[in-house]
A protein has these predicted regions:
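Domain-level signal for soluble alpha/beta catalytic cores
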Residues: 1-208
């Protein structure tokens, strides 16, 4: 699989360069999901032992031009589904750094990487079942920022000049269904939004 991923990355880098892109990406070929830029880097989430079973049975009942709803409460990978923490999260690898090093090695122009922003991570964290590990969302997000700042620092040290903070979750704050989900969990959407903005600012503070 890693050899196939390597070849796919080389191919997509060449294609981007052939179109004159001044900065290229690796196409995220080493991820099941873009959200793995964080979940694959840490240990401590309460997840099933065999996550592959989730992907094998996953069915979103997708219909063209219609909203596909997902059951975020089912047992599955962290962040793709809402999972709690069995222990405080700890870094076990830096996937974006691994991606950057390979992309940079096969590219003739600078490579960029993406890191999932704190907002999506917080939205998919089952804080209510993790109060024996984290005091609440504020405590959890503060820890996420600390972890991701170290990941970014490692990327900067390796020479990466282009780091995208991926923040798709901000659309939730104008989406009725998502807002209702937050309120049903006892959360204040406006407080969540401000926390996420503050977290993003803290994440990039001091970096060039």
């Amino acid at each position: 699989l890693s050899q196939a991923q390597d070849q796919a990355i080389r191919d997509v880098v060449v294609r981007q360069e052939s179109h004159g892109y001044p900065v290229v990406t690796d196409g995220e070929f080493r991820r099941h999901s873009f959200q793995e830029s964080f979940s694959e880097c840490v240990a401590g989430f309460d997840v099933p032992k065999n996550i592959n079973l989730y992907y094998e049975k996953r069915n979103l009942n997708e219909t063209p031009l219609e909203r596909a709803e997902q059951n975020f409460e089912e047992a599955g990978p962290a962040i793709i589904t809402r999972r709690g923490a069995a222990q405080r999260l700890k870094v076990v690898r830096n996937l974006p750094l691994e991606e950057y090093r390979y992309a940079e090695s096969v590219a003739n122009v600078p490579a960029k990487v993406t890191i999932l922003g704190p907002d999506r991570i917080a939205q998919r964290f089952k804080w209510e079942s993790s109060l024996n590990v984290y005091k609440g969302l504020d405590d959890f997000v503060e820890h996420i920022v600390a972890i991701e700042r170290q990941m970014i620092a490692d990327l900067v040290k390796a020479g990466c000049k282009y780091i995208q903070i991926d923040a798709p979750g901000y659309t939730a704050y104008v989406d009725k269904v998502s807002l209702e989900r937050m309120r049903s969990r006892g959360e204040d959407p406006e407080r969540n939004l401000q926390r996420s903005i503050d977290a993003d600012n803290a994440l990039i503070e001091g970096f060039p």
